[in-house]
Amino acid sequence: IDLEFVAVTHLHSGHVGGLETLLDDGDITIGKIYLKPFIGTNLAQWDKCVHDGDALYQSLNKKAQSMNIPVIDCVPDEPFALGNWALRFFNTEPDSYHKNICENDNSFALLAEQGCRRILLAGDMINDTGDLVRLANAVGRVDALKVPCHGERAVPQEALDKLRPDTLIITNRLAEISDDVLVGIMSAFGRRAYSTSDSGGIALT
């Protein structure tokens, strides 16, 4: 299996933990890794203690360098091609100015487009500093949305009104999804919603 790249949305173990397993698998090759630099000076103390993003960053960098896999810490914000798809990262700059944030504020999102099809993978992006609203305004209408932050945090109505996805993917158990998310996304739009715990692995075709 050849992976052209792996994108690490942010430095929380739930989004990074499986990468070393991929790196250790001799049947998988990775062309490069997109990973924003870790900036801990403005992170809330609880986030540093619970997740230790600095250790994750150092470990991944060391492992990748030992395997001669480039780590791209200046994540591009211009569209680029992957086969027949056009991809674009959003929220690519580390947040170095807001105070007492969590690492989710540094999560980037990935928009994939092919013809009229548009899929938004929103990582763990939250709206504490307005990121989700800015993202929705920049992206507009999508066909499918990987719901940010596992559905545990509410998505602002302003963002939902812009995105209006037909299909929603939630990487969580439905029982752990925020009531605000269930009401704001599933009920308001009556769209198809799938959770990985109930549906298993999910592939968009």
List PLM regions with ranges:
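Active-site metal-binding loops of divalent metal-dependent hydrolases
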Residues: 10-11, 38, 76, 92-94, ...
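Acidic, metal-coordinating catalytic cores used for nucleic-acid/nucleotide bond scission
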Residues: 10-15, 50, 151-155, 174-179
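Short acidic, gly/pro-rich beta-turn/loop elements at beta-sheet edges
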Residues: 16, 43, 120
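Core dinuclear metal-dependent hydrolase active-site scaffold
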Residues: 1, 65-141, 200-205
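Binuclear metal-ion centers of metallo-dependent hydrolases, dominated by the metallo-beta-lactamase
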Residues: 32, 40-88, 101-104, 167-205
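A short acidic, amphipathic alpha-helical/loop segment
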Residues: 18-22, 131-135, 155-163, 180-185
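Active-site metal-binding motif and surrounding structural segment of the metallo-beta-lactamase
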Residues: 1-39, 135-152, 164-168
